[in-house]
From Swiss-Prot:
Keyword Nucleotide-binding: no
Protein's name in the database: Small ribosomal subunit protein uS15c
Chief subcellular location: plastid
Keyword Ribonucleoprotein: yes
Originating organism: Psilotum nudum (Whisk fern)
GO cellular component: chloroplast; ribonucleoprotein complex; ribosome
Family the UniProt entry places it in: Belongs to the universal ribosomal protein uS15 family.
PANTHER family (UniProt xref): RIBOSOMAL PROTEIN S15, BACTERIAL AND ORGANELLAR, SMALL RIBOSOMAL SUBUNIT PROTEIN US15M
Domain of life: Eukaryota
Length: 86
């Protein structure tokens, strides 16, 4: 279940890079999703999940504007869908 960051991110980028933040948020989203499948009426966890999803989306938007090649590589490795463009 855990995402192997060493496959996605270089050694010197592991701490606070945008890519590592997106990976960590994706892992938290997966854990919270499993929790909410068992406890469907846990509304505070659901609110926290929505907050994490918004944070990941804003980081993905930032990454598309600054480094589109890295964005494409990251979403393919994490199995995420592309962002909708307006």
């Amino acid at each position: 279940m855990a995402i192997d960051l060493s496959l996605i991110i270089n050694e010197k980028e592991k701490k606070g890079s945008i890519e590592s933040q997106i990976c960590h948020l994706t892992e938290r989203i997966k854990r919270l999703t499993l929790h909410l499948k068992k406890h469907s009426k846990d509304y505070s966890s659901r609110k926290g999940l929505y907050k994490i999803v918004r944070r990941r989306k804003s980081l993905l938007v930032y990454l598309t504007k600054n480094n589109f090649v890295c964005y494409e590589k990251l979403i393919s490795q994490l199995g995420l869908r592309r962002l909708k463009t307006h």
